[in-house]
């Protein structure tokens, strides 16, 4: 007989609202499923909030969603949708409150540009915070998506083709170099789908 500690899942999406769709698991059902599989702690990726919202806004919203529901331990990755001095100050405040990681995006409407990425990584390094990143080249993806759409190529295989391994690898390379400029700011690449992308890590 062996006794091992409970698992920690650092990439969940409980109660996630994306447009008209909502994740099937909330903090009650998702945490029960996790516990049944031996996971005793999750760190949930919270969704984007309203445009220009504070970092605290989404953390507070997710505290409301999870309160008195989870049967296991949980925490959150914050989400950064834009960068300004107030956001950088909030990173400090949330870190002091126990939020030790933030997620940024290099694609989608709330992506950060390279200047914003630099500022966030710099602040995170100062704090000892980890930055999780969804790394894809947004501009190329949009061009490929438009190309396939015009050609009527809308089957699921073209979703993958519009997000080529090169789009992933380029973004991983770019953010890795920005982290190197900051003398190894800590990064967590949250989606890695190709050998080409892995080789850029």
Segments predicted by a language model, with ranges:
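Metal-associated gating/positioning segment near the N- to mid-region
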Residues: 2-69
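Alpha-helix termination/capping residues and helix-transition junctions
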Residues: 36, 68-71, 96, 181
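Active-site mouth loops of central-metabolism enzymes
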Residues: 10-25, 49, 53, 72-86, ...
């Amino acid at each position: 007989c062996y006794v091992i500690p409970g698992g920690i899942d650092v990439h969940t999406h409980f109660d996630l609202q994306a447009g008209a769709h909502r994740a099937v698991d909330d903090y009650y059902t998702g945490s029960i499923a996790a516990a049944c599989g031996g996971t005793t702690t999750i760190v949930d990726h919270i969704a984007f909030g309203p445009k220009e919202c504070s970092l605290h806004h989404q953390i507070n919203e997710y505290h409301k969603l999870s309160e008195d529901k989870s049967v296991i331990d949980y925490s959150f990755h914050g989400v950064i949708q834009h960068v300004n001095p107030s956001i950088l100050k909030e990173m400090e405040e949330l870190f002091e409150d126990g939020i030790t990681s933030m997620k940024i995006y290099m694609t989608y409407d709330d992506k950060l540009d390279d200047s914003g990425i630099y500022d966030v990584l710099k602040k995170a390094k100062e704090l000892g915070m980890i930055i999780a990143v969804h790394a894809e080249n947004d501009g190329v993806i949009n061009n490929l998506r438009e190309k396939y759409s015009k050609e009527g190529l809308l089957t699921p295989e073209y979703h993958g083709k519009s997000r080529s391994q090169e789009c992933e690898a380029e973004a991983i390379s770019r953010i890795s170099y920005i982290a190197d400029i900051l003398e190894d700011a800590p990064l967590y690449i949250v989606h890695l789908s190709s050998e080409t992308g892995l080789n850029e890590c």
